């Protein structure tokens, strides 16, 4: 509480007010420096006029005033530089304060979450998850092995079928040839030739 019953300003509000006052002071100094530059040019012009008129004593006094004026301008420039540095420092302090507040909020949130987390239950959940994952992997491996066995059996059946056909063809070719006239029907010769061609094609595909 302040002396007048108002609420006390927070550090953020005080920093904001300080920065506003510093900016106001810099603007006022800029205006004063611009005014003194005009006065400086007037002094230089008067000194030249007095020197041309031979009024050296007056020119000397005016030159002394010019030196003092320039000294005042230099001091104002130095003060302005200081104000600028203070303003920058204030901005840095405000940024650091904002970052500190954010870190404090994050720390508080993390602390709350840690308090609410049941480590024992979390460990049980992770163990159950790992167990179920292993079961799924084992099932996938078993299914893959079954598919591989089926493919192997199918390929073996194909090879065996081709070998049997080859043996049958070989035995057929070793049989003594029979004259056409000894066959009861001439259509049997055509049938044997067709089967012979199909067997040859099958053997070539092996």
Curated annotation (Swiss-Prot):
InterPro entries with a match to the protein in the record: Snf7_fam
Functional note: Probable core component of the endosomal sorting required for transport complex III (ESCRT-III) which is involved in multivesicular bodies (MVBs) formation and sorting of endosomal cargo proteins into MVBs. MVBs contain intraluminal vesicles (ILVs) that are generated by invagination and scission from the limiting membrane of the endosome and are delivered to lysosomes enabling degradation of membrane proteins.
Protein localization: Endosome membrane
Organism: Dictyostelium discoideum
One Pfam family in the UniProt entry: Snf7
Primary location: membrane
Family classification: Belongs to the SNF7 family.
Comp. bias regions, Basic and acidic residues: 9-32
Topology in membrane: Peripheral membrane protein
UniProt name for this protein: Charged multivesicular body protein 2a homolog 1
Region (Disordered): 1-32
GO BP terms in the entry: endosome transport via multivesicular body sorting pathway; late endosome to vacuole transport; protein transport
Subunit structure: Probable core component of the endosomal sorting required for transport complex III (ESCRT-III). ESCRT-III components are thought to multimerize to form a flat lattice on the perimeter membrane of the endosome.
Highest taxon in the source lineage: Eukaryota
Keywords: Coiled coil, Endosome, Membrane, Protein transport, Transport
Coiled-coil residue spans: 12-80, 114-148
Gene Ontology terms: cellular component: ESCRT III complex; multivesicular body
């Amino acid at each position: 509480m302040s002396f007048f019953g108002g609420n006390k300003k927070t550090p953020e509000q005080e920093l904001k007010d300080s920065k506003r006052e510093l900016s106001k002071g810099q603007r006022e100094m800029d205006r004063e420096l611009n005014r003194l530059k005009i006065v400086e040019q007037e002094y230089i012009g008067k000194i030249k006029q007095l020197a041309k008129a031979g009024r050296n004593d007056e020119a000397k006094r005016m030159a002394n005033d010019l030196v003092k004026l320039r000294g005042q301008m230099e001091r104002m420039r130095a003060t302005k530089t200081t104000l600028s540095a203070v303003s920058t420092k204030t901005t840095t302090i405000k940024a650091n304060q904002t970052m500190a507040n954010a870190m404090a909020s994050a720390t508080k949130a993390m602390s709350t979450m840690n308090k609410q987390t049941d480590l024992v239950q979390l460990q049980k959940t992770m163990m159950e998850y790992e167990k179920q994952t292993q079961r799924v992997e084992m099932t996938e491996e078993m299914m893959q092995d079954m598919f591989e066995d089926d493919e192997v059996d199918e390929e073996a059946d194909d090879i065996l079928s081709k070998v049997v056909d080859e043996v049958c063809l070989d035995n057929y070719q070793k049989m003594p040839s029979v004259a056409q006239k000894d066959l009861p029907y001439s259509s049997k010769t055509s049938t044997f030739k067709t089967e012979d061609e199909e067997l040859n094609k099958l053997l070539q595909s092996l």
